[in-house]
Amino acid sequence: LQPMEQKRVSLLFGDPNRYQDIEMFLSKDTDFWMEQTLQYFRSLTGELKMEEDAMAGMLLQRAYQQAFGAFAMSGENEILGSNWGTYPVTPHVWNKDMYYSSLPFTLTEPELCKKCILWFAKYGIKYKGTKFEGGVFHSLSNSLSVIMLSGAYYEYFGEKEFFQQHPKLYKKMKAILQTVLESREENEPYLYRTTWISDAYALGKYHTGTNLCMYR
C-alpha cells in the first residue's frame, strides 16, 4: 500500500472441515458481511438512542454484541463454552461469566437461549474432582443458572414447546430445587448456604446474592 492508502481485509477463524462455511464466506466481500452483521443486531435490538446520554446507548448495544462474541460454537451449531473463562474441554470452568453472557439471549435470541439452557443443565453443577466434592452447594448460584435462564426465557417468550420436548430438563430443575429446599433445618431462616459464589469463597453463614438467585 502507498502512504495513507487503506484497504479492508477479511479474516476468518474457521474449521477446515467445514469447507461449506469457508466457501460461503469467500463468496462475498468484507462490506457485505459487515452489513449483514449490523443488520442482524439491528433486528434484535433496534437502534437505541438516549438523548441525555448518547454514549450510554452505544455502550449498551456494544455490550450486547460482546456477549454474542463470547460464545464458541461447534460445527454442529452447538455451544462449546464461552471465552470469558469457560470451556468445558478444560478442568477450569467459570460458569458465572458464561451465565452473564447468556442473559441478553433471554430477551432477543430464543434459539440461542435454548442452547444455553441445555448447556447449563449439563455443566451448571460442579462435578466431583480431586479437590472438591462438587454438587449443588459447591456454588448454589451456578447450580441455579439453568432454572433462572429457563424462567427468564419462559417469562419473556411464553413458549412451552421447548420444555415439553425436553422432559428431563424439568425433572432436573425440580430435583435441584428439592435438594435446596430440603437442606434447610427446621429452626433456620428461609435462607440457603453455598460454599462458593463462583470462583471465590462465599463468606458468612448466608450469601446475599446467592439467596437472591434462589428466590428469583
Question: Can you describe what each PLM-predicted range is?
Answer:
Residues 33, 41, 94, 185, ...:
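Tryptophan-centered motif/residue detector
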Residues 69-87, 122-136, 181-203:
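Glycine- and aromatic-rich loop/turn segments at beta-sheet edges
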Residues 29, 168, 172-175, 195-200:
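Secondary-structure junction/capping motif
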Residues 26, 45, 83, 95-102, ...:
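Generic, low-specificity signal for short hydrophobic/alpha-helical stretches with a mild N-terminal bias
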Residues 11-13, 20, 67, 130-132, ...:
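Generic preference for hydrophobic/aromatic residues in regular secondary structure cores
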Residues 4-23, 135-141, 177-216:
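The feature captures the catalytic groove of carbohydrate-active enzymes
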Residues 1-91, 161:
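Acidic/polar, glycine-enriched structural segments that form the non-catalytic walls/loops
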Residues 91-187, 208-211, 215:
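Aromatic-rich carbohydrate-recognition surfaces in CAZymes
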